[in-house]
């Protein structure tokens, strides 16, 4: 009997100590102003992670739609997380300060922006490596969008030809589900 209890306690202890599977919110990134940020701060929220560029043909359409999405859903545990990238057509050549100024001045963006990074290849930021590996979809141009659930798991990935408006119903459904869960928890 004592041996059985000891074995049960060992199994419980082993399960409690088992490493948790890595997710998007386990990473850190430098924000647009140079401060290291743990993406953990977004855990519990729905995130739309996007590689952005200031001089792309998709810039105007996407920045406007992303800001509208942030405005509409931001108060409800949602964030657009923008990562400038200069890998595709050299369409993000400016400094972080200039990128932020452009986005805020031209589109009044209120969503979090991060420092310019690589999103593909050997120098890709670890968070984007995770997005690529778990979704099976690697960015091939600017404005790839990855929908991340409150638990950090990737729900979907879309290329820039898919508009924010087209995926808005999926985003809204995920936010609605989160709101209902939070109400249940009260």
Swiss-Prot record:
Broad class of where this protein is predominantly found: secreted
Signal peptide start and end residues: 1-18
GO biological process: response to oxidative stress
Gene Ontology MF, one: glutathione peroxidase activity
Subcellular location field: Secreted
Keywords: Oxidoreductase, Peroxidase, Secreted, Signal
Reactions catalysed according to its record: 2 glutathione + H2O2 = glutathione disulfide + 2 H2O
Organism: Bos taurus
Disulphide bridges: none
Record-annotated active site: 56
GO cellular component, as recorded: endoplasmic reticulum; extracellular region
CDD domains referenced in this protein's UniProt entry, alphabetically: GSH_Peroxidase
E.C. no: 1.11.1.9
Similarity-based family: Belongs to the glutathione peroxidase family.
One of the Pfam families matching this protein, by short name: GSHPx
Entry protein name: Glutathione peroxidase 7
Top-level class of the enzyme under EC nomenclature: oxidoreductase
């Amino acid at each position: 009997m004592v041996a059985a209890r000891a074995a049960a306690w060992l199994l419980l202890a082993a399960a409690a100590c088992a490493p948790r599977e890595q997710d998007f919110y386990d990473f850190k990134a430098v924000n647009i102003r140079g401060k290291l940020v743990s993406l953990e701060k977004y855990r519990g929220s729905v995130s739309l992670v996007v590689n952005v560029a200031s001089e792309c043909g998709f810039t105007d359409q996407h920045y406007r739609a992303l800001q509208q999405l942030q405005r509409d859903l931001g108060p409800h545990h949602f964030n657009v997380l923008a990562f400038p990238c200069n890998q595709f057509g050299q369409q993000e050549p400016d400094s972080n300060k200039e990128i932020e100024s452009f986005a805020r001045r031209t589109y009044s963006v209120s969503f979090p922006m991060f420092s310019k990074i690589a999103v593909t290849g050997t120098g890709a930021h670890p968070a984007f490596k995770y997005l690529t590996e778990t979704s099976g979809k690697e960015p091939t141009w600017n404005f790839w969008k990855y929908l991340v659930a409150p638990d950090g798991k990737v729900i979907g990935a879309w290329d820039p030809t898919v508009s924010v408006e087209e995926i808005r119903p999926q985003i809204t459904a995920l936010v609605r589900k989160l709101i209902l869960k939070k109400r249940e928890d009260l």
